Amino acid sequence: MKKYLLSLLAAVTYTTAQSVSGSAEGFASGVTGGGGATPVYPADTAELESLLSSEGEQVIVLTKTYDFTGTSATGTACYSWGTGEGCQLILQDDCGDTPSTTVTYDAAGKTPIPVASDKTLLGVGSEGVIKGKGLSFTDNVSNIIVQNIKITELNPEYVWGGDALTFDGSSNICIDHVETSLIGRVHYVFGYNPNSGITLSNNFINGETTYSTSCDGYQYWGLELVGKNDSITFKGNYLYKTSGRSPALSGSTKFHACNNVWSDNNGHAIEGNEKGQGLFEGNVFQEVATVVSSTFWEAGDLFLSSADGTGNDACASYIGRNCASSIYMNDGGDYTSYTDVSWLGDWSGLTIAECAEAREIEGTVPTSAGNTL
């Protein structure tokens, strides 16, 4: 009887986790992923890779840790940021005049799992963890949902040791309630091929790390966005202990950042080139040394909503409502002069997510972001 009850309890628990919680907001609205496909539970890492890469609709449920670590490789690593304790090395064959060494690392971290179209990947509670390998969305894949999982331990000591989530020629993808931590290079990287209709929501970008380029436990590599005409909704995310590229609008990206919390950033948050477009509203910047990098921001199109509402009504002509006010707490740099919104005319036809005032979300986002469902 006891065994039967335990089995019944497990079945009930899994049933509640087999369907997506909520729906995608913003640019990925309408995404269905694996739809109503019968949920499958991969037994091991090999089956997980096989299911994610297979054709057709799939709902894949993670109930444990899938550990890809332990596949050793050796290579040359450069001491590009010093030899002190906590300094990252960079994996590359030629270090030039920079001191170098031979290192052993996990080979799996450098090769992410390719995810095929029409997939839903769900975690049960806090149990769904992928350790030592990331996910990639390339070659025109579309209609994918990833929700309530954790991706962690991708060679954190080494730049080029692995990226958590890679997008390069993809569309209609929602990444929701995902925690990324201890990542060798970038948490979210968007390659040069277009990525349209992407929503990153309620995620925890945990930059607290054992190794970093600044040798101080703050990760520099947050979000690198180099795609052509990418459209990304970034809502409800918590970014903790980063020091740069959070995000880097390095391509011609349309980036809507709404109701996010940046906390304890000892470098800079926003950077980008002359083609990037960033609409930032209803956000909280708390203890951010430099909100926008004057060194790395190359006069692209950027709007930062004000704290007191001044100028936020300028958004109404383009998105049908005023932009939500933001909160700036003990922050540095110039974050008051990014007031032009005329470039939002380029966003005609895009689905713009609703956005609350920052004061309404500042206490909830840090505790709800990540694999907390």
Swiss-Prot record:
Report the Pfam families cross-referenced here: Pectate_lyase_4
Of the GO CC terms on this record, one is: extracellular region
Query: GO MF annotations for this entry?
Result: pectate lyase activity; pectin lyase activity
Its recorded reaction(s) are: Eliminative cleavage of (1->4)-alpha-D-galacturonan methyl ester to give oligosaccharides with 4-deoxy-6-O-methyl-alpha-D-galact-4-enuronosyl groups at their non-reducing ends
* SUPFAM superfamilies named among the record's database cross-references: Pectin lyase-like
Q: Where are the transmembrane segments?
A: none
Disulphide bridges, residue numbers: C78-C95, C87-C215, C315-C323
Q: Which UniProt keywords apply?
A: Carbohydrate metabolism, Cell wall biogenesis/degradation, Disulfide bond, Glycoprotein, Lyase, Polysaccharide degradation, Secreted, Signal
Q: Is Glycoprotein there in the keyword field? A: yes
Top EC group: lyase
Reported function:
Pectinolytic enzymes consist of four classes of enzymes: pectin lyase, polygalacturonase, pectin methylesterase and rhamnogalacturonase. Among pectinolytic enzymes, pectin lyase is the most important in depolymerization of pectin, since it cleaves internal glycosidic bonds of highly methylated pectins.
**Membership in a protein family:** Belongs to the polysaccharide lyase 1 family.
Q: What is this protein called?
A: Probable pectin lyase C
* Taxonomic source organism: Emericella nidulans (strain FGSC A4 / ATCC 38163 / CBS 112.46 / NRRL 194 / M139)
Lineage summary: Eukaryota, Fungi, Dikarya, Ascomycota, Pezizomycotina
Q: Which gene encodes it?
A: pelC
